């Protein structure tokens, strides 16, 4: 089954320096994490702090969700971390 992203929530994790968001596959919730470096790479004007990274995520949500779906289809795991190389 394909992933869906019905929950627009996202949050910044300062300990892991990433933005966290969730996808759904049927009744399963799958957590995803996008590294700060990846967000700064796809949004060059992003600042590497919480407001800047959340804004970069919001501006590139469709692109990030597409990458998440592509990675999920290849490998099924409990959670996923997206790096710069994953978001094309």
What is each residue range found by the language model?
Residues 3, 10, 30, 37-40, ...:
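Flexible, active-site-adjacent loop/turn segments at secondary-structure boundaries
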Residues 17, 29, 62-64:
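A generic signature of intrinsically disordered, low-complexity regions enriched in glycine/proline
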Residues 19-45:
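A short, structured beta-strand/loop element
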Residues 1-23:
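Short, charged/polar N-terminal "headpieces" of proteins
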Residues 45-88:
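Acidic, low-complexity intrinsically disordered segments
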């Amino acid at each position: 089954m394909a992933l869906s992203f019905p929950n627009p929530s996202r949050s910044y994790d300062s300990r892991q320096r990433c933005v966290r968001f969730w996808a759904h596959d049927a009744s399963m919730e799958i957590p995803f994490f996008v590294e700060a470096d990846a967000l700064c790479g796809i949004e060059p004007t992003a600042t590497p702090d919480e407001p800047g990274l959340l804004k970069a995520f919001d501006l590139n949500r469709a692109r990030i969700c597409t990458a998440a779906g592509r990675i999920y289809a290849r490998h099924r795991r409990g959670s996923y971390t997206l790096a710069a190389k994953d978001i094309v």
